[in-house]
Amino acid sequence: MIAKHLILSGRVQGVGFRDWMVTRARRLALAGWVRNRADGTLEALVAGDAPAVEELLRACRRGPPLADVTDIVETFAEPPAEPGFVKRATG
């Protein structure tokens, strides 16, 4: 299992990105969370089998139809303590 902390930049808020990401992460049996940040970026913690995490990262580079992802900063992280993948409030 691997875990990654992500910060996505570009047009990533107001385009349904969080719900889109929750759906894909759950399909891939990943754990973690996603939330909007006050600075206009999107933040996520994603954990699971390495191939599934990488598949979600590839999908995030495209994003949902109205999104325009210009950058993803990823760092390795500790896995979340709780199972499942959830949408969090803006932080």
UniProtKB/Swiss-Prot annotation:
Q: Name one GO molecular function term.
A: acylphosphatase activity
| Name the UniProt record assigns to this protein | Acylphosphatase
The record, for SUPFAM superfamilies, names: Acylphosphatase/BLUF domain-like
Species this chain originates from:
Acidiphilium cryptum (strain JF-5)
This enzyme catalyses: an acyl phosphate + H2O = a carboxylate + phosphate + H(+)
| Enzyme active site | R18, N36
Family named by the database record: Belongs to the acylphosphatase family.
The record places domain Acylphosphatase-like at: 3-89
What EC number(s) does its UniProt record assign? 3.6.1.7
Keyword Cell membrane present in the record's keywords: the answer is no
Question: Which UniProt keywords are listed?
Answer: Hydrolase
